[in-house]
A protein has these predicted regions:
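Bacterial N-terminal signal peptides
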Residues: 8-21
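C-terminal "tail" modules appended to repeat-scaffold proteins
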Residues: 338, 359-362
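Alpha-helical transmembrane segments
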Residues: 349-360
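N-terminal leader/targeting and pre-domain segments
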Residues: 26-344, 348
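N-terminal secretory signal peptides that target proteins for export/translocation
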Residues: 1-6
């Protein structure tokens, strides 16, 4: 009998511990923090990680309330929510400059011309973190800009519909790291004054940063571009990192200007990649990158040299007119003249498709 007592004691302890553990799980509940309605201040709603999908949908935030807050100049602070409906930034009021008295006719004409450009303002911070956005985000004004004066933070958020924030000016840093864009993500002619954080972000069928300007650093380490990725004619004043990034379809950096470090180490380009006429004013790193299809570096300018000898090229890259490159180190093996012509023709056809597609979308 005595030999059984320790076992019974251990069993009793195990049951008690199990009960305690079970109680702890039962006590973990969905918590919701929100700002009271009808009062000034940010539109705030935070749902804890313990909330179920049903609980998040029951506490969904309508897009209309977000647009109302932005129209009133209030900040938006949403964490762990479901956002239902479209955010159409073209609905924000247009800001016009008052024309003071006493100006010359020339000054009045210049100010009137500025007022012809539509300018919309988002005054407060916009935070939508670890959330699900079911509707679209749109700014499609063809003759105006959308200016975000505060921070924009979309960390870990899933966008189920398209995002088009083209012709936007971001005065503070933009954070979209670990976000998921299931459809298109357009930031055409954007201006990023403090840079872009997009590490480990998954982009969908089409991503466009065409002619965007980045004054601050760009960190897209480990990002996945599932579809076409356009960085044509971008200007990057600060270091840029696409280290370990994955590019699934055609990728265009043609005409880009990298004034500081451009890091493409360990990146994988599964389809055609275009770096024609790119200016690398700073260090260009491509060590251990992989180009599995055609790569076009023609007329690129490596002002501080290149490390393309450390790159895996499945096809010999095009380097006609390229400056600052060790020609003998670019690519492994060689192709016949017919193969080179075939590669050139294929790249030109893909480039023509990208241009036609871009014109169609404008």
């Amino acid at each position: 009998m005595n030999t059984m007592r320790p076992c019974g004691f251990v069993l009793l302890c195990a049951l008690l511990m199990g009960g305690l553990c079970h109680t702890g799980v039962a006590e973990a509940a969905c918590t919701v923090e929100f700002s009271p309605g009808g009062k000034p201040g940010p539109l705030m709603k935070h749902l804890s990680p313990d909330c179920t999908k049903a609980e998040r949908e029951a506490n969904a935030v309508p897009a209309a309330s977000v647009m109302q807050a932005l129209t009133q100049g209030r900040a938006v602070d949403l964490v762990g929510v479901v956002l239902q409906g479209d955010l159409i930034f073209d609905q924000l009021p247009v800001r016009k400059s008052q024309i003071p008295k006493g100006l010359t006719p020339e000054q009045q004409a210049a100010l009137s011309a500025l007022n012809d450009e539509e300018q919309r303002i988002v005054a407060g911070n916009v935070t939508i973190r670890d959330s699900v956005v079911e509707g679209a985000l749109r700014h499609r004004s063809a003759k105006g800009t959308l200016e975000f004066e505060g921070t924009v933070d979309f960390h870990g958020t899933r966008f189920k519909d398209g995002v088009d924030l083209s012709r936007s000016v971001f005065q503070r840093v933009v954070t979209i790291d670990s976000a998921l864009f299931e459809r298109e993500a357009y930031f055409v002619q954007g201006h990023f004054a403090q840079g872009l954080r997009c590490a480990d972000t998954k982009f969908g069928p089409h991503t466009r940063f065409h002619r965007s300007v980045f004054r601050g650093p760009v960190d897209c380490q480990g990002s996945l571009f599932d579809g076409m990725a356009e960085f044509l004619e971008v200007v990057c004043d600060a270091p840029v990192s696409f280290e370990r990034a994955r590019f699934g379809l055609g990728t265009g950096f043609s005409g880009a200007q990298f004034k500081k470090l451009a890091n493409f180490s360990d990146a994988i380009f599964s389809r055609e990649a275009f770096f024609a006429f790119v200016v690398f004013s700073g260090e260009a790193r491509f060590a251990d990158a992989q180009f599995l299809q055609a790569a076009d570096f023609s007329n690129a300018d490596f002002k501080r040299g290149d490390d393309l000898a450390k790159v895996r090229f499945d096809q010999k890259p095009l380097t006609n007119g390229t400056k600052g490159i060790a020609q003998e180190g670019a690519g492994k093996g060689g192709q016949s003249t017919f193969q080179q012509y075939a590669i050139t023709l294929g790249i030109l056809l893909v480039a023509a498709f990208l241009v036609a597609y871009a014109v169609k979308l404008k």
